[in-house]
C-alpha cells in the first residue's frame, strides 16, 4: 500500500490537523502553570500543593494512555482522538467555574483521562500512514503544535489572570480549544493502513510486557520520563523565582517569559529534518547536551542570561522529545499504539513525579536545588542516549537508519 509522502496535499492536511491537536493538548494541559502562584494565594495552599493542578492531570493522562492506546487497536484511531479532544475542551471550560481548589483538582483529574485519547494514538497514526523518510518531519510539526500550545496556554492564562482573573483565563483557553478540536476533526483523513483487532486482554498484556523487555525501547521510555520531568520542574518553579526578589516581576510580564518556548516550534521541525538526514542517535545526544547547558545557565542571576538558559533548555527539550518519540514509532514493529502509549506513560509520569518533587527541592534549597535535581536527571538521560548510540554500532537485524 502507498504511504503518504512529504509535499503532497494529504500530508499537509494531516500535519495541519496534528499541529492543531498538539496545540490543543498543550494549551489545556499547561494553562495552569502561570496560575499556580495565584492558586497559592487565593486557596491558601503551598507551592507544592499548587503544583498538583498540573501533576494530577499528567498522572491520569499517563495511566489512561495505556488504556486508550490498546482500545485504538480495536476501535480505530480517528474516532477516539476526536472524542478525546472534544471532551477535554468541555472540561477545560468547566474548570473555569471551580469554586474551590478541591473542585479544580477533581476536574483537572478527569481532564487528564480525556486528554489521553489523542497523544496515545497520534504517534501510532503517523507511524502507520506516513512514509519512513517523511516521519521525522511529520512528527516535528506535530510537536511544534505542542510548543505553540504550551506557549499560548501559559501566556494567555497569565495575562488574563493578571488583568481579569484565573476563571476568565481558563474559560478563554476552553473556547479556543473547542475551535482547535473542530479543525482537527475536519482535516484528519481516516486511517488507510489500520487493521482492527479483537480485544484480547491476554495478548495486549503480553505485548506491553514485550515492549518493556526491549532494552532499547525501555531506554527511550526512560529518556521521555526524565525529559518532561525536568521541563515541568523548571517551568513550575521558575515563576516563583521571577515573581520574587531580586526581579519582583508582575504576573503579566513574567508570563511573557514563556515566549521563549516558541523556539520549540523551530527546534522540533528542524531536528525532525536532521533526524531524517543523520539518524536518531547523534541528534538525541546533541539535544540532551543542549538541555543540560540551558538548565545550568538559569543559575546565573542576570535576568537576560536566565532567559537565554530557558530558551536553550526549551530548544533541546522539544528537539529531544521529537527524536525520542519518533524513534519509538520506528523501533516498535508491532502494536505501535501500545509502544507509543508506553512512551507517553513514562513521559507524563515524569511530569507528575518531578513536577511535585521539584517543590520539595524548592522549599529546601530554592532554585539551586531545583536545578541540581534537573541536572542529575538529564545526566542519567545522557547516559541512556549514549547506550542507544553504542547499540546502533552492534549488529541488529532491525537496524535501518540509526536504530529502527
Curated annotation (Swiss-Prot):
Any one Gene Ontology molecular-function term assigned to this protein's record = transmembrane transporter activity
Q: Where in the cell is it found?
A: Cell membrane
**Topologically, how does it sit relative to the membrane?**
Multi-pass membrane protein
Top-level taxon: Bacteria
One GO location term (cellular component): plasma membrane
Checking Pfam families in the record gives: MFS_1
Keyword Transferase among record annotations: no
The protein's UniProt keywords, in alphabetical order, are:
Cell membrane, Membrane, Transmembrane, Transmembrane helix, Transport
Q: Which spans are transmembrane here? A: 16-36, 49-69, 79-99, 110-130, 133-153, 166-186, 221-241, 252-272, 283-303, 307-327, 342-362, 364-384
Record keyword Transmembrane present: yes
The main location class comes to membrane
CDD domains under this entry? MFS_NepI_like
What the entry lists under InterPro entries is as follows: MFS, MFS_dom, MFS_trans_sf
Q: Which family does it belong to?
A: Belongs to the major facilitator superfamily.
Q: What is this protein called?
A: Uncharacterized MFS-type transporter YybF
Organism expressing this protein natively: Bacillus subtilis (strain 168)
